[in-house]
Regions:
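N-terminal hydrophobic/helix-forming segments and targeting peptides
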Residues: 1-222
Length: 222
């Protein structure tokens, strides 16, 4: 999720390194392959996707061992309830959790059913109490993402997966680097991925400040 992009950054470093002149990072953690031009005063072109996805962060471990969370990035609360998630501790331990749901008869307001707030949704890892949850290394600030595998549709024409926004962009810049491998360019090219896009385009500010591109192509999807 935003602010915790290290695994995707490591993947991109591996994919970019064989095809570029150097790999650099910006001040926030965005990573970019650089292809230098032999031309003098050549234009600077930045092609950037983003590494982060939306998720949650533990804000409170309750006495009964369940968790309250805050959202990282934009979420529709209607798709959060009664779903499987993975919680990652500081030590990298993966904990299966499930999100609770409010019974329909408790969501009906005077004007009809109301949408639950993220702060009202409890996450449950099956722990007896707060002490047991903490014994597994769980702390406020731990991250939570959907527990979802990529699957091929029955007609084998499409893939269903979480985080297309923006793993697809990461794939595109990786393939662009491969396709341009060994080619001489008439411009300086920086291609890679920003961080913290889902929480306010923060990474884009860092990378554009670092590279000062004359052309910036954002690669994203939704």
């Amino acid at each position: 999720i935003s602010g915790h992009e290290a695994p995707v950054r490591a993947y991109l470093r591996e994919k970019l390194t064989p095809h570029v002149d150097e790999v650099v990072t910006d001040g926030l953690g965005g990573i970019f392959g650089v292809k230098h031009s032999e031309a003098v005063n050549s234009p600077r072109v930045l092609v950037a996707s983003h590494m982060d996805e939306v998720g949650f962060m533990v804000s409170e471990i309750k006495a009964d061992g369940t968790f309250r969370v805050v959202s990282i990035g934009g979420w529709n609360p209607m798709v959060v309830s009664s779903q499987r998630f993975k919680l990652f501790t500081r030590e990298g331990r993966e904990i299966p959790v499930i999100s609770g749901s409010v019974p329909p008869h408790l969501t009906r307001g005077t004007g009809g059913p109301t949408m639950p707030a993220i702060s009202d949704i409890v996450f449950d890892g099956g722990f007896a109490d707060k002490a047991e949850a903490e014994s597994f290394g769980i702390r406020p600030g731990d991250t939570i993402v959907p527990d979802s595998s990529a699957i091929l549709t029955a007609n084998e024409k499409n893939i269903i997966s979480k985080a297309w926004d923006n793993r697809y962009g990461v794939l595109m810049v990786s393939e662009l680097a491969e396709n341009l491998s060994g080619q001489k360019l008439g411009n300086e090219l920086y291609l890679g991925a920003n961080v913290q896009e889902e929480v306010g385009l923060r990474g884009a500010h860092a990378s554009t400040t670092k590279f000062d591109p004359e052309v910036f192509l954002a690669v994203d999807c939704s």
